[in-house]
């Protein structure tokens, strides 16, 4: 049994690892910090100072013992630590030893061994909250200059059963330390794998992990301390000790290298700032504030703006915000345990007895300073019969010894004996708190004025230099997207995100943009628009990636541009001044077809597209070994480090991720800039094909490096393009058949910037109508006019689409009721009449919403519809339906029905529809399109004839709706300014002119009226090319 205090407090060995016996095995540490270590040989145990002979005899279990501190006078058994070592009638535990010859103490009937290196949670700086939520195991991190920082993606918060163990804090924490001195200390240690953590001397409040690698290079990794958490390499930890434990036992810091040897400071460092509450406070609901009592002690983690601080309350272990007006500094001379709920630093021994007997219950406890040995502590514990005391001795290496066991903190001792018996049949339960919180405080504080001051403080200023803020969707681990609140902080180039704007204090995560690139994400990758990704790039091969989505294309573009300005790779790109040349690269890929894919591996092949090693897009799956995709992918404003594209082929299955089977790579340097390359690429295989040829893939690629001069250089070029006759536009339309989509996009942005989009669209539409002989084939072909109209509608009518469709589509997504009418697709015993009734109900609600949404369409778009109606009426005056059908062909065929069929592409939903919902959306789109065409279902789809009564009853309303859309006779004034990069758009159009200069030259010799304009265009194109070369030379000189 462990002897309690009698006349003197129980002693114990003072030095760990020399003369004291420490318990070994898993019971010596909390379960979450357990690690197996090799056992050292049995060691001699030195007698403890102040331990009476009778106490020693009882502690060793040598027979009957008596005294006021014991439970009885007969044989005694005690439990302290879980390892029973017996040496007589009594069973003694917790480092029990027996007196041997010459006064030495030898172990009896058991072996106590001391680990060569005692590991456990840190007991010094910083605080040790519960274990962190660990990310998946990963490869190493890259290194950065200390002025930079290193971070990565947020991982989903989930409990991972990985034990984290680290040496005590005093073995690796050096406090504020110069970089040069840190490197000297590591080199003096002389072992690769040596490490230390220090506070950055360049960025106070941040920490640096300094590590000596196998190449004898000292690498410095910045650790971002934020509201009690610690971020490094995309991973978040609750303490520096957990971070050390993770990179010691779980993951590599550099490729193949872990933390091995802590380098201790010359003497232990304790530099945490502590403050004490001078007044009580009750938190404001739904904030990150914490409530506290007068006298509570806090550890300060972050000093935020406007007097706010992020702290841990030592009494409750709660973290949150407090304001500095309610606290006072705690000096270094005060005991570091002040503020802990179990610590009583200013009461006597008798007062401790009285508290336990009056306020406490059986198994209650408290800790106070030792009366007999300054610097030591006594743990007071109440049993059924009496109060027992146990001595706690600090050791020179900043640990604490009790009963022959070594711990990293008194808190660890308490945690241990909450789980293990401290006396047979007893565990520590509830501590007795201090009874008079005000005894150490100045009672003359003017609380009223302080509280009034706090009410005037704002928490909006926690983060300095906020460049941009707002909500974005962020992709989680699976297919879920979550709406989070983001702050782009400019001073430290960090993107910080939170659960909501109301709780924008403690981050959910952060990304250090100085080691990042921003990549576009094609709509095909997630089946939704407006996505982009931030790639955290390390020296290791693995990338950490964050995916985001904006509500609109403009929002996504704004965020991308804002983020790119702080990415280190962007900062290094040449030409940031308005008076210098900018360079922007882009890539257009057409995945056309594959030939002779291996039959064994492909039934439903699809392609994944990568820029370098980052996936940015994918095609649809197609059937067979000779699939045809004919899909286009445009990647704009590429990061400057992109030097190749890769295409892999996978086979579509029901698995969450299909493995890549075949692949091809192409260096961008192979492609002629500004020209389309059409080539069959031989495929290589990731798996053995056993003599089978992997096949080939046809890809058309166009890589362009845009050299963008200041906007004023393009003034004459712009005037020529904007001439109301549109001769240049017609000529480019003639020569740019394969680049039609790109040409349309550039022209639309230029004309939108000049508020001349109606001139462009109406003129091209009129020309299309004038050239068409058959009313039934009008706008059926894909032309520059139809492409421009489609792009313009998607750019301006998003609000209309959401208002008209979102509610109905969300109901379809949630419903389990089928709308299937086709006999070949009906399930057994499925009632087709029930399905039809459900379909008609959906159609009625949806069409009603569409009819009521006409006023939401932009007035300029409605004016263009009106111009279309006038033009077709003039061309076909006897055709009464053309004015209706020409508008429905754009509004429904190219806008509403595509949004119904694929609502993710229009950002209406975030998850893929179920098979039932997908089929319902198809039937709804089919029915709505027939209604818009004013056509009933016939013999081709007889199972759909049940929808005909609905179509008949709504034909008149459809005609009225479409006529109303075009009822804007005058071009409306608009105050909206198109947010485009005009100089870039003009430069891109100039590149198209350069690429097609030969065709334009041929055309200028054929077209009489346009001849003068085209020759002028060619001359301006050549002049701009010369100016561009001059800018390039100037940039090279600089």
Swiss-Prot record:
Residues 270-332 form the SH3 domain. This is Ras GTPase-activating protein 1. Interacts with SQSTM1. Interacts with SPSB1; the interaction does not promote degradation. Interacts with CAV2 (tyrosine phosphorylated form). Directly interacts with NCK1. Interacts with PDGFRB (tyrosine phosphorylated). Interacts (via SH2 domain) with the 'Tyr-9' phosphorylated form of PDPK1. Interacts with tyrosine-phosphorylated EPHB4. It comes from Rattus norvegicus. Phosphorylated by SRC and LCK. The phosphorylation SRC inhibits its ability to stimulate the Ras-GTPase activity, whereas phosphorylation by LCK does not display any effect on stimulation activity. Residues 1-16 have a biased composition (Low complexity). Keywords: Acetylation, Cytoplasm, GTPase activation, Phosphoprotein, Repeat, SH2 domain, SH3 domain. Inhibitory regulator of the Ras-cyclic AMP pathway. Stimulates the GTPase of normal but not oncogenic Ras p21. The modification N-acetylmethionine is found at residue 1.
